[in-house]
């Protein structure tokens, strides 16, 4: 990035300052109960309930998850189409009203929700897959939207301490888009918020492939990789079929001690995507001088990437799909600001193994040959 483009990227028209919350829903009481149970197992405590709506706030560190079961709402409509899903997210911004107005002026579609008596009007637009993208300017020293709209339980802090697993903040979240729409959504974020591409990935596993553009806001605190499939069989296409459309694929949460976090989550029954044993045979040569405990990495199936002498390292691991096709990532950054590019192929192939076990891929040489032939025709 040259000096001019760097200066341009510092222009922050939305006044972004990170993620405020991620919102989840499900089509029935059983699904809502499953979400609540999942979040507790991940270290989130139910700390408050909405004053007038069937919405609950779950919190860990600086991460806020909202569970929305309100009848006749956008969340209910979203769940009726997608099943258990991520129906919205919110950005922290300097002025929520101005942020919404700017986004609409740049072509975003306004969202108008049902506002009850004495409730905050939280400005929002439609995002990927008709999920909501809200703008929140009440945070930090300016108070909180939850103080107005929610009632906190008397023991909410004790609840948090009891289940905490060491997750601190949302590091990034990803979008899965239909083929041809990766550029549509990257352009959307560039247009409404001056997001810029910081990484481009072209990933090919043994049988399938994907493309991804990682976009970041001018504040540097909101990072959104946007994925599209390179073929008909990849996990991106499977997600789109199962989810019945585009949407948020996974939410990455940061830990300062990933070993402690993963041991805690595994003890609570959290399942993680498999990593081949052969991956750990190459760690010392691929990430020379990493100084991590290789036995612990292998025991917990944690992935490592980066270069200690250049840009630092990161540690990461991915849960099984737990909300329909949606999953979570746990990440610890030790100087590295990437997304685990060196791990993508190993991760991609581990997901393919899971797809083969479930019958989505047949794993045969004919499949591989067909994919290569199709790629050459593109």
Map each language-model feature to its residues.
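N-terminal beta-strand motif that seeds the catalytic metal site of vicinal oxygen chelate
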Residues: 1-31, 86-89, 145-186, 244-253, ...
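An N-terminus-focused feature that recognizes amino-terminal "leader" regions
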Residues: 1-154, 172, 179, 316
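Short, structured motif recognition centered on aromatic/hydrophobic residues
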Residues: 18-25, 39, 44, 58, ...
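A cross-kingdom feature marking solvent-exposed beta-strand/loop segments within repeated
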Residues: 49-59, 64-93, 97-122, 157-165, ...
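Short, acidic, Ser/Thr-enriched surface-loop or helix-capping motifs
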Residues: 127, 309, 321-322
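Beta-propeller domains
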Residues: 175-223
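Extracellular low-complexity, Gly/Ser/Thr-rich intrinsically disordered linkers
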Residues: 324-341
